[in-house]
Amino acid sequence: MKPPGPGNAPRIGVCCEELEALLEQAKREPLREEGYQKLKAAIRTLGYVTELLEKKETTLAALRELLCPASTGKTGKVLKQAGIHAGEKKPATESTSKKSKGAPAGHGRNGAAAYRGATKAPVPHASLKAGDPCPDAQCSGKVYLQRDPGVWVRIRGQAPLAATVYELEKLRCHLCGNVYTAEAPPEAGEKKYDESAASMIALLRYGSGVPWYRLRGLERSLGIPLPVATQCEIVAETAAPLQPALDELKRQAAPGEVVHHDDTSMRVLSLDRDADISPERTGVFTSGVVWIFQERRIALFFTGCKHAGENLAEVLKQRPADLPPPIQMCDALSRNVPKSFATLLANCLTHGRRNFVEVTSSFPEECRFVLETLGEVYGYDDQARTLGLSPEQRLHFHQEHSGPVMEKLKVWCGAQFAERKVEPNSGLGKAISYLLHHWEKLTLFLRVPGAPLDNNIAERALKKSILHRKNSLFYKNRNGAQMGDLFMSLIHTCELNRVNPFDYLNELQRHAGELKQAPSEWLPWNYRETLARTGALLHAA
């Protein structure tokens, strides 16, 4: 988690010439909103940087990283910035030599199979069918149907919302004055805003972080002028019927084998405090909790004064007492540990690695050794994932390959202090101390089946909340925060399980009554089977 400051606020690009122009404008007339925001950002940045400079532990490298953060934390990029170029790299390890030499994952074009939300349209041949003679005059064979058809993908754009204006014909009697209006067709529906409108607004707002004013502007430019208050009301009315799905996700998450979680700061303008929270605690947070249970992943978000460990404890209250403690992956902050429930605590190896990344420019060779050593461990974990190993097989694989590597790193860290090669209070000394102090929790993956290496999945989940904070700045009250938590939880759970969140939200609204009666049958991974079963029963009846 980053400390409060400019790094956690929306970045605004502004140059010295613009600031000078804003000052001149302020002498003549009141500033416009855009100019005011730029000037306010510049003043806040100056104040924050001044506070940092007054602290003796602040380094120029840390200040440069804060104001101009690196685009990547990959080892090669970090070492290159420290002056260690590709030509100086050590020989490839066994883990890296086995990797594919092709394009990096995620690059290149997608095949037709990747378009899971596309409509499939079978196209028969215009002049041939299976069994017909071959059109080639020099051939006497017959054509047959191939298993794989030819594929042509056509992609079209569409507006987030669409509207149909039904102009109902009206007839008036010239004698008695009665007016007779045509009835709306069945497809017009009974409600002005159908389920798909609410789903799309929620998906853009809480799934993609689009603020209300920007969403309103986009729709208005496309000819659908929907006020912010109306859209907010639509989403609020949708949230209540979907609450049983969130409650069921929490219940099914409680027996999970592994839980990842982290916190980020959030602002709620009007927040009534929980009775069990100390009055001295003034912060407001959003906790992102990702549970892994039987190959399923459940994302839960909690916004309020409670820390991640306290929110985790609320879910663990529903955990069956006969189950063993879950594996808990988080950073090393004490507030992340639930007070009243036992867990197998693992700390994030990426956090330990990040401490060395920050001081690489000052200690290039020492940090190079640590970064490449940890890179080797991650290489072995990638191999285990590629091979599809079970948790027990993965544990033995890591013990055989990563165990000696981590032991070598531990010996090296201890030698830096024992031989007085590193000053304990230096940046490198603090990074080494962090590793040694949390060594048992950082290496749980060498002792417990299924223990992860890092907390990256929770940090990625929190990006939804961070995106909301950067674009919308705050929630108005607790109800707004809870509504955001609900939709973020449902949407991100769908994404983690490769389910279409738009379709899922639509079906939950259409079957709100069934959802309330049997929420366990309307979860992202089984609602399709429930729909098929319900449809079959209705058809049979």
Question: Residue spans of the language-model regions?
Answer:
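Catalytic center-proximal scaffold of phosphoryl-transfer enzymes
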Residues: 1-29, 33-40, 111-115, 131, ...
